[in-house]
UniProtKB/Swiss-Prot annotation:
UniProt-recorded name of the protein: Transcription factor SOX-3
Organism classification: Eukaryota, Metazoa, Chordata, Craniata, Vertebrata
UniProt remark on domains: The 9aaTAD motif is a transactivation domain present in a large number of yeast and animal transcription factors.
InterPro entries tied to this protein: HMG_box_dom, HMG_box_dom_sf, SOX_fam, SRY-related_HMG-box_TF-like
CDD domains assigned to the protein according to its UniProt record, in alphabetical order: HMG-box_SoxB (cd01388)
Any one GO CC term of the record: nucleus
Residue ranges: DNA binding: 46-114
GO terms assigned for molecular function: DNA-binding transcription activator activity, RNA polymerase II-specific; RNA polymerase II cis-regulatory region sequence-specific DNA binding
Motif (9aaTAD): 263-274
Gene3D superfamilies on file: High mobility group box domain
Protein role: Transcription factor that may function as a switch in neuronal development. Keeps neural cells undifferentiated by counteracting the activity of proneural proteins and suppresses neuronal differentiation.
Length: 312
């Protein structure tokens, strides 16, 4: 009985290496079968029949590779394509006939053949998809990051339509109509942000008239030292007219322009007086304010809701 127990204890157990050998052998068998299936699938894959260019370039490629052993295959293909285009139809004819014969043989051998193009790799799209913004690149690759970000910005700008002329393209995309007069050559020479200033051309001309009158009156001798105050009043008038709000001003007709010119002559004669006689300064100031106030009431213009020039 003890001898039987000793023999059972002494029986060698299968080692780990022995247990792993069948598994390793099975894995090798599966791998070999997969490799054999891959080779068999490559062998079973039917190639397309050669066209005329392939028939011609078969010998030319070998010859060019022997002459230029360091030349890449893509460069050889480019040169062969350029040489093939330079051949005449008479020179291409035998290769075209050979390609037709090979196609007929291919159709006889594989009547059920159907061309299945291989799927192209999308490496370029993956690179652009997983590219980092400019501020997330490491310091060593700042130049490459700047180039990549610039290319992506140009791409997205082109997709969205926001190129260098973003303002004009935005107007075209949103469908905003333009006035036919906006396409005149005079307006095209001006900047687009200066367009609101064109609406005030009559008022600015009136202000220019007053300013020119102020310059003219500076050279005329005035009594009682009224020259500085007159220049100051006209200068303030020009500044008030220039700082008017952006609302549309009333239309100034030729009648109102003639009235303004008449008032301007009255103001000049008021300073000079009849026969060059001087009047009292307070009377001159009161009449000047009255005439200016009457002019603004007739023109219908109010500056910031207050009567202009009341501070003088």
């Amino acid at each position: 009985m003890y001898s039987m127990l000793e023999t059972e204890i002494k029986t060698p157990q299968p080692t780990r290496a022995a247990r792993g050998e069948p598994a390793r052998a099975a894995t090798a068998k599966v791998g070999g079968a997969a490799a054999a299936d891959g080779c068999r699938s490559d062998q079973d894959r039917v190639k397309r029949p050669m066209n005329a260019f392939m028939v011609w370039s078969r010998g030319q490629r070998r010859k060019m590779a022997q002459e230029n052993p360091k030349m890449h295959n893509s460069e050889i293909s480019k040169r062969l394509g350029a040489d093939w285009k330079l051949l005449s139809d008479a020179e291409k004819r035998p290769f075209i006939d050979e390609a037709k014969r090979l196609r007929a043989v291919h159709m006889k051998e594989y009547p059920d053949y159907k061309y299945r193009p291989r799927r192209k790799t999308k490496t370029l799209l993956k690179k652009d998809k997983y590219s980092l913004p400019g501020n997330l690149w490491p310091p060593g690759s700042a130049g490459a990051a700047a180039v990549g970000v610039g290319q992506r910005i140009d791409t997205y700008a082109h997709m969205n339509g926001w190129t260098n002329g973003a303002y004009s393209l935005m107007q075209d995309q949103l469908g905003y109509g333009q006035h036919p007069g906006m396409n005149s050559p005079q307006l095209q020479q001006m900047h687009r942000y200066d367009m609101p200033g064109l609406q005030y051309s009559p008022m600015m001309s009136t202000a220019q008239t007053y300013m020119n009158a102020g310059l003219h009156l500076q050279h005329v001798p005035r009594p009682y030292g009224q020259q500085p105050s007159t220049a100051m009043s006209l200068g303030s008038m020009g500044s008030v007219v220039k700082s008017e709000p952006s609302s549309a001003p009333p239309a100034i007709t030729s009648h109102s322009q003639r009235a303004c010119l008449g008032e301007l002559r009255d103001m000049i004669s008021m300073y000079l007086g009849p026969g060059g006689d001087a009047t009292h300064p307070s009377a001159l100031q009161g009449s000047r304010l009255h005439s200016v106030h009457q002019h603004y009431q007739s023109a219908g213009t109010r500056v910031n809701g207050t009567v202009p020039l009341t501070h003088i």
